[in-house]
């Protein structure tokens, strides 16, 4: 995972050049922002609730908020690099991990077709 933003965001709010600059920026959070803040502290970023102006339990909504230039998003490199409008923010820092859970109802996992899709998604999300 890395931070990504579109040109519109960078033009409006400026480019963060070091970890300390990130506290002056807005982010969109997927899921529980407190948990994400905890993971980000592990990579040296001191962010708080005020930095997360937007939050959603839908990654599509998170993506659109960032794509419209309203916030920086945390994205998987494999996905973000397929969209030229997104550029890495603080590209020099090492990619970091945030646990991602891929879940399905137990009944769906017994279907061979669903299991195949599930396994393909798991491989793609893990970077295999």
Task: Give the ranges of each region predicted by the language model.
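A late-sequence structural motif
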Residues: 92-128
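C-terminal regulatory
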Residues: 2-100, 127-128
């Amino acid at each position: 995972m890395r931070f990504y933003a579109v040109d519109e965001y960078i033009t409006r709010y400026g480019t963060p050049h070091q970890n300390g600059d990130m506290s002056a920026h807005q982010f969109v959070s997927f899921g529980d922002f407190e948990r994400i803040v905890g993971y980000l502290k592990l990579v040296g970023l001191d962010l708080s609730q005020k930095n997360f102006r937007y939050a959603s339990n839908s990654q599509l909504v998170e993506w659109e908020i960032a794509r419209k230039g309203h916030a920086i998003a945390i994205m998987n490199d494999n996905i973000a690099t397929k969209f030229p409008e997104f550029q890495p923010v603080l590209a020099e820092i090492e990619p970091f991990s945030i646990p991602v859970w891929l879940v399905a109802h137990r009944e769906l996992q017994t279907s061979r077709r669903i299991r195949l899709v599930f396994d393909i998604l798991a491989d793609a999300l893990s970077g295999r």
